[in-house]
Design a protein with these regions (language model features):
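Extended, low-polarity transmembrane helix blocks
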Residues: 1-30, 72-132
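Short low-complexity stretches enriched in small and charged residues
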Residues: 22, 36-38, 68
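Solvent-exposed, well-ordered loop and adjacent helix/strand elements within mature globular domains
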Residues: 30-55
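A generic alpha-helix surface/boundary motif
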Residues: 27, 39-40, 62-64, 86
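Core segments of alpha-helical transmembrane spans in multipass integral membrane proteins
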Residues: 30, 51-71, 78, 110
């Protein structure tokens, strides 16, 4: 039976994971919806990076699907992997046009994996941050 300290630590890790994960999830959901709605700034941004406007909705759907997979506890690791690929593409796209915003997808990826790290003990076993 876990001690009171262990269960408090587990609860604390769980809450930290929710907070850390909420930041990129809120950003990704709002960006995905913006791609579906297609306001002028989104279309202008796509034009600046050299993407066809026909990709806006497709990328918005992809972004929302990957985020939904991340939000489902049973598929959260798969969602993190999918979002890593998506955000990697975003990073390269920004770097290709010398856009200084290339760091934003990297930070989102760190938050995605950080939130998952706090709530997924199997991930902590695979990537230990300290030696026992």
């Amino acid at each position: 039976m876990p001690s009171e300290t262990q269960s408090q630590t587990s609860k604390a890790k769980l809450w930290v994971s929710y907070i850390v994960s909420a930041i990129p999830v809120l950003f990704l959901v709002s960006c995905g919806i913006a791609k579906l709605v297609q306001p002028a700034p989104v279309l202008q941004g796509f034009a600046q990076i050299g993407f066809a406007q026909s990709l806006v909705v497709r990328l918005g759907i992809l972004e929302l699907i990957c985020t939904a997979v991340y939000l489902i506890p049973r598929t959260s690791v798969l969602g993190a992997i999918l979002l890593t690929g998506y955000l990697g593409g975003a990073t390269v796209t920004h770097l290709r046009v010398s856009d200084p915003k290339f760091v934003a997808p990297v930070i989102l990826g760190v938050f995605i994996w950080g939130g998952l790290f706090f709530r997924e003990s199997r991930l902590r076993a695979l990537i230990p941050l300290k030696r026992d």
